[in-house]
Structures are given as C-alpha cells and as structure tokens.
C-alpha cells in the first residue's frame, strides 16, 4: 500500500531539475513517485528525462506535449522537440504512457492524469464545476 507520495509535473525535458527532484524525493523516503506528464518540449534532454523516470519506476501519465510530439502537432510551441530527435526507445516510452493511472494508497484510490480524466487539455480553476471521474 502506498503511503507517502512524491509528485512531479510538467518536466518539459528539464533533465537536471528532474534528477535533482528525484534525488530529493528519494531522501524523503517516499513510497512512490508520480509524474503528471509533459516530458516533451523544453530546453533540456528528453532522453535523459524518460530514462530517469523509467529507471526510478515513476508512475507517469502522458501530457498534452507528449501527445503533440508523438502526433507531430503544435510544433510551433516554444522549445518544441521533434520525433526525429528522440530515440526509438524514447518514442516507445512516450507511446506507452497511459492517460490515467490508478493507484491504491493508504487514503484510498488515487487517479493520476494530466488534465481531467482522459482530457489532457482540461483545466480546473477555482469555481469550476466538473463531473469528471
């Protein structure tokens, strides 16, 4: 059963910061680390990012930037990365990421997603009402 959880989100290829965060979370003796996606599109190294996440067995979901990279969409965004710059293993890792991960925790079921449920672009703001499950 998972008790203490470390959360990472919107990595955006920041491999140095990701490594630092994973190291800090390891020092905190968390039971699991989860990542809300968006590994792609940033100034750092996407290869080092996906390898670090996989190596640390981080529960990771796909974000909209990961989907955009795989589908070759919105490549006009700042610091966009392209499929040609990602290894076959890296592309396979990104393609394997689910939209939703469910984990049993000491506090009950945790549902991890990038947006809301399977909509990676959905946002929640104060006052927003939703029926997403």
Residue ranges: model-predicted function:
Residues 80-133:
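Acidic, His/Gly-enriched loop-helix segments that form or flank divalent-metal centers
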Residues 2-96:
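Core catalytic region of metal-dependent phosphoesterases/phosphodiesterases
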Residues 1-12, 31, 103-110, 115-118:
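Mobile, glycine- and charge-enriched loop segments
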